[in-house]
Amino acid sequence: MSRTSLIKLIHVARRELQLDDDTYRAFLMQKTGKISCRELTVTQLEQVLDAMKERGFKKLNKYPRRRFKEHVTPREKVYKIWQQMAEDGFITDGGDVALDKYVQRLTAKRNGGQGVSTLAWCHGESLQVVLETLKQWHIRCIREAFSRHGLPLPVSPSGRELRGYDAMTAAYAHARKTRRMAQ
């Protein structure tokens, strides 16, 4: 880390630890024998920062991690869920043709018998219905898999049963990763 970055971080730590000027300078004097960051070497600055961390300072990331690096369209989500279901063994054909047939069957019910023949042509409310229906199907498959393997359904830290799509898929992936479920 650069000298300037270390000095900035030390000053952030000073504010976080609520050190007044006299206490801060006494702290520097105790750790390095000097009363100003300007007089310190990079090694000494690192020592001061480490000492502040020992006193309770925690460096927080300025920006929290984001779920997606870029915007993912509903159409891409449908495609990824379809492929994940195939990878998990819930459907036998994870290809585009099978997905298009599913979309056509699903949209035919809503459009009075005439379905959208491919995912690429599906827009708006129809696309949202396809996405949400596919997520619910995937959740049902995950619940059945937990039951089939004799595992309890995952619960939140408060003890409530998980219901959200992201939480259920993460729990299923964790169960497979830890080999609690055969792949």
From Swiss-Prot:
Localization: Host cytoplasm
Keywords of the record: Early protein, Host cytoplasm, Host-virus interaction, Modulation of host cell cycle by virus
InterPro entries: Phage_Mu_Gp16
Swiss-Prot/TrEMBL induction comment: This protein is constitively expressed from the Pgem promoter unlike most other early proteins which are expressed under the control of the Pe promoter. Its expression seems to escape repression by repressor protein c and thus occurs throughout latency.
CC annotations in GO: host cell cytoplasm
Main location as per UniProt: host cell
Highest rank taxon of the organism: Viruses
GO biological process: symbiont-mediated perturbation of host cell cycle progression
One Pfam family it belongs to: GemA
Function statement: Early protein responsible for decreasing host DNA gyrase activity. Promotes DNA relaxation of bacterial host genome. Modulates the expression of various host genes probably controlled by supercoiling of their promoters. Host genes affected include DNA replication and cell division determinants.
Record note on quaternary structure: Homodimer.
Family listed: Belongs to the mulikevirus gemA protein family.
The protein, known as: GemA protein
Organism: Escherichia phage D108 (Bacteriophage D108)
Gene that encodes the chain: gemA
